[in-house]
Regions:
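Alpha-helical, largely C-terminal catalytic domains
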Residues: 1-376
């Protein structure tokens, strides 16, 4: 199951495009949208917590990632068609989504992960968190619609008006969304975060499956969840919420700097250290000026702290495994330029020595060679 999900996320997750039946000037993949929604949800959570409300950020991240799995199976139903179906018959679409999830969960995989997916998706008790998720999705759709409507206004007019009306209804129920929509600086900050969808990895190579830094962060976060779960089963006491926050935030500077590849970073002594200073200065100049000082202090440890404690080590392992799977999917699509990189990364992954990472290498990577067609 895990290998199949990892494969689907890099396959359909990158090839599924938002607004795919609309003319558009911006390509947004399923994973790009998911990544931005997570970042918006976490920013709204921060704003809510400034008003002394406690938000379950772990639930936000897991619910959004787990709920996206259905879309990977039901890839042919776009968002607006889905909304119309829901408006006419919620029950029948719920049955369809349940069947899609069953197709995933019936595959062989760790039972505790399957149970966590089911429990998280069935937990409707967290009303504030669910409202934040709803708001984040609408806001992400709104930002996508703004871009494309500037050129194709006659096509997007009705959709844009519907999204704006929905946002207005939601902002009356959610103070953090009202604060976001009322604060131009916050919107500028999130615009820079959204730029991660346009910062691409492996830019020195031709790719069959181009992957943005935003999509990569979602993928790393899911891998971190898997590694944590398996390690936790074997006596680890690492804090998963902190791990997932490190995973989703750690590449934010690349919205400004772009993705500088590791060989370049390590080509001469001292260059890595200079880049770290540059990242901090560019974040100050381009992004942090739009947010309060306490938000900067909150988020900075997830971005700038070195990979030297156990949580950072797991996040770094997940980052490397993401590169491994990204290279693997290229090889499987006859892109031989990635074979040497794949073998080098695999050798590195073999040296990590954790139960979870050994399991990833020995079993899950083989799922990329299997042709599992998941249809309901």
């Amino acid at each position: 199951m895990i290998g199949t999900l990892l494969n689907l996320m890099l396959g359909r997750g990158l090839t599924m495009k938002r607004w795919n039946n609309f003319p558009r000037i911006e390509e947004v993949s399923h994973l790009d949208n998911l990544g931005f929604v997570i970042h918006v949800a976490l920013f709204l959570a921060y704003l809510e917590e400034q008003k002394w409300k406690k938000i379950d950020k772990l639930f936000l991240i897991k619910r959004l990632i787990f709920a996206s799995f259905n879309r990977l199976v039901l890839a042919d139903i776009n968002s607006w068609t889905r909304e119309y179906i829901l408006s006419l018959d919620k029950e029948i679409f719920k049955k369809l989504e349940d069947k899609a999830l069953e197709k995933i969960l019936e595959l062989e995989g760790p039972e505790n992960i399957k149970q966590d997916i089911k429990d998280t998706l069935n937990d409707d008790s967290k009303e504030l968190e669910l409202l934040i998720i709803e708001a984040a999705k609408k806001y992400a759709g709104y930002r996508e619609c703004i871009i494309n409507s500037r050129v194709y206004s006659e096509v997007y007019e009705k959709t844009f008006n519907i999204i704006k009306a929905d946002l207005e209804k939601t902002r009356s129920k959610l103070p953090s969304l009202d604060e976001l929509l009322s604060n131009e600086n916050y919107e500028k900050y999130l615009s820079h975060v959204r730029g991660l969808s346009h910062s691409f990895r492996w830019i020195q190579e031709n790719r069959q499956f181009p992957i943005s830094v935003m999509a990569h962060l979602v993928y790393v976060t899911f891998i971190s969840y898997i590694i944590w779960t398996l390690e936790n089963d074997n006596g680890s006491d690492l804090v998963i919420e902190e791990l997932l926050l490190k995973s989703i935030y750690h590449d934010i500077p690349e919205a400004i700097t772009g993705d500088i590849i590791t060989p370049t970073k390590r080509s001469i002594p001292g260059f890595v250290e200079i880049l770290e200073t540059v990242e901090l200065k560019m974040m100050e100049d381009y992004m942090f000026e739009y947010v309060p000082e306490d938000y900067k202090n909150y988020i900075s440890p997830y971005i700038f702290a070195p990979f030297d404690d156990e949580l950072w080590k797991i996040a770094k392992y997940s980052d490397i495994f993401s590169a491994l799977f990204e290279a693997k999917i290229e090889i499987n699509n006859w892109n031989e330029a990635f074979r040497e990189m794949y073998l080098n990364i695999k050798n590195k992954a073999n040296s990590f020595g954790l139960i979870s990472t050994d399991y990833l290498v020995k079993y899950w990577i083989d799922s990329f060679d299997e042709d599992k067609k998941l249809f309901v």
